[in-house]
A protein has these predicted regions:
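Preference for intrinsically disordered or flexible, low-complexity segments
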Residues: 3-11, 15-320
Length: 320
């Protein structure tokens, strides 16, 4: 049975035998009419996104320059300068620290799995983050705690950079080879639940998305992917990205924003899309966790992604 057939039967919960409504169901139907399966199918088809899932395994030996990977030393062009960030750690010690190298992606390799055709067709994409301070991302001052660099030159000119001497060993991720796959996704309830949506109940929504073939993720910290929708642990993050990008702290409820400002932020939040999600990274006796079983999420404006402008990416960290 296909996704449409499942959805077509989705809301027929109050049917009796032989498909006939019982007396209670008939009475309830007058008070509350659920959305049609056709409407749900049309909405899901319109909002679904493709994600590039990432599976990793220990590399064993150094990978060739330009290969997609997590950890190890980044393969960079001549003149590369390792990014640093000045911020406070968990003991409130403020200093300039080197960012941990997280991953690099050969976009020509990834492109096969980018079914929505939103990433550049070629080049290298590098991700860095201050793993020592683990900034949450909801403070405008956190800008720079994560960096995304793009290189579209000759891959043959790349070579492995040396780790900075002041980068602690616990943030030097062992090199991992990657395997990609494509999968379609729907947003988690926190991101879906906006005015005018077809479904107004989270349990009903999770049931419907499972029937559509996009069930919610049970353990987000085990998910690593490019694109798609974030596996939300706390709250929806696109509004936070837009708020912080305007220089507004959003670590608490903002009561001083006008209704018009809040409406504009909510509207502009639609411009933001997930670029990368990383959960806990582990290899034998190495483990790098974000908070307590959390994830880090890199978000980018759609127009910036089209323009290959990765200088305004925002990072968000969520954990349990």
């Amino acid at each position: 049975m296909g996704a449409f057939d499942f959805l077509k039967n989705f809301l027929k919960k109050s049917r009796g035998k032989n498909g006939k409504e019982g007396p209670c169901a008939a009475a309830e139907k007058k008070e509350e009419q659920g959305p049609s399966s056709d409407l749900i199918f049309e909405e899901f088809s319109a909002i679904q996104k493709n994600a590039v899932s990432i599976a990793y395994s220990h590399a064993g030996q150094a990978l060739a320059p330009g290969k997609s990977k997590i950890g190890g030393r980044p393969h960079v062009p001549q003149g590369f300068v390792w990014p640093y960030f000045e911020g406070a750690d968990f003991d409130n010690v403020v200093k300039n620290r080197p960012l941990a190298f997280l991953a690099q992606f050969d976009l020509a390799e990834v492109k096969t799995f980018d079914k929505d055709d939103v990433l550049p067709a070629k080049g290298m994409l590098y991700f860095f983050y201050d793993a020592e301070t683990q900034r949450w991302g909801f403070d405008p001052a956190d800008k720079g705690c994560a960096r995304v660099l793009y290189y579209d030159g000759d891959v043959g000119a790349l070579s492995a950079a040396e780790f900075p001497d002041d980068l602690p060993a616990e943030y030097r991720i062992p090199e991992q080879r990657l395997v990609f796959s494509a999968r379609r996704e729907l947003p988690d309830w926190e991101e879906y639940a906006r005015e005018g949506r077809a479904i107004g109940d989270w349990e009903e929504y999770d049931d419907a998305r499972a029937r559509f073939g996009c069930p919610p993720t049970e353990e987000p910290d085990g998910v690593h992917k490019l694109l798609g929708y974030a596996d939300v642990i706390q709250d929806e993050m696109t509004e936070e990205c837009e708020t912080v990008a305007r220089g507004i702290y959003c670590g608490d409820v903002r009561s001083d924003l006008s209704a018009a400002e809040k409406d504009d932020i909510r509207a502009r939040a639609e411009d933001w899309t997930l670029l990368l999600q990383l959960g806990t990274l582990a290899d034998d006796d190495f483990e790098l966790m974000w908070g307590d079983c959390g994830c880090i999420y890199f978000y980018i404006r759609r127009q910036d992604l089209r323009d290959k402008n990765f200088g305004n990416v925002r990072l968000m960290l969520q954990c349990t």
